[in-house]
Structure formats: C-alpha cells, structure tokens
C-alpha cells in the first residue's frame, strides 16, 4: 500500500493493491483527473511527479517530459507526491 500526497491540497490518499493504476486509485478517492484513453496514448492525464517513484504498467506512448507521469499507465512505487 502506497501513500499518495496531492501537493496542491496536501491531501493524502492510500493506493490499494487492487487498484490497477494510479488513475484508478485517484478515482476511487473521488479525485477528478482529466483523461481520455486510459492507456498512455493521449497524455490528457499528464501530471508532475514531485517526489517518489512509479512503476510503469505499460510504456507511455504520449510524450512526457522528465519528471512527468501518466497516472493511467503507472502505479505508485512506495509513497509519492504529485502535482494535483
């Protein structure tokens, strides 16, 4: 179980092992995340990873800068902080 901190609000959420992605974990806590494809193609869910690391479920096809993640195709690897 990983703790996700949302930097803008300071809210802390727990990611359960049954969440298939970080996006699913955020949605389970009623965090509104913009998305379209849910598979790493469009980049709509792009956000900045402030602290920690993620495991990629699938290699994102959308262009991301260093320090950015796509919550739809990754999972938290331990505690993380994201720019939301």
From Swiss-Prot:
Cited InterPro entries: 2Fe-2S_ferredoxin-like_sf, 2Fe-2S_ferredoxin-type, 2Fe2S_fd_BS, Beta-grasp_dom_sf
Cofactor note (record): Binds 1 [2Fe-2S] cluster.
Disulfide bonds: none
Cofactor(s) for this UniProt protein: [2Fe-2S] cluster
CDD domains associated with the record: fer2
Phylogenetic lineage: Bacteria, Pseudomonadati, Pseudomonadota, Gammaproteobacteria, Enterobacterales
Protein known as: Uncharacterized ferredoxin-like protein YfaE
GO process annotations (BP): ferredoxin metabolic process; protein repair
One of the record's GO cellular component terms: cytoplasm
Keyword terms of this UniProt record: 2Fe-2S, Electron transport, Iron, Iron-sulfur, Metal-binding, Transport
Keyword match Metal-binding: yes
Residues bound to [2Fe-2S] cluster: 37, 42, 45, 74
Domain 2Fe-2S ferredoxin-type, chain residue ranges per copy: 2-84
Species annotation: Escherichia coli (strain K12)
Gene Ontology terms, MF aspect: 2 iron, 2 sulfur cluster binding; electron transfer activity; metal ion binding
């Amino acid at each position: 179980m990983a703790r996700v901190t949302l930097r803008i609000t300071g809210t802390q959420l727990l990611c359960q092992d049954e969440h298939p992605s970080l996006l699913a974990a955020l949605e389970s806590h009623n965090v509104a995340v913009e998305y379209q494809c849910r598979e790493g193609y469009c980049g709509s869910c792009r956000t900045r990873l402030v602290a920690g690391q993620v495991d990629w479920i699938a290699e994102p096809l959308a262009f991301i800068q260093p320090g950015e993640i796509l919550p739809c195709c990754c999972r938290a690897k331990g505690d993380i902080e994201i720019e939301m």
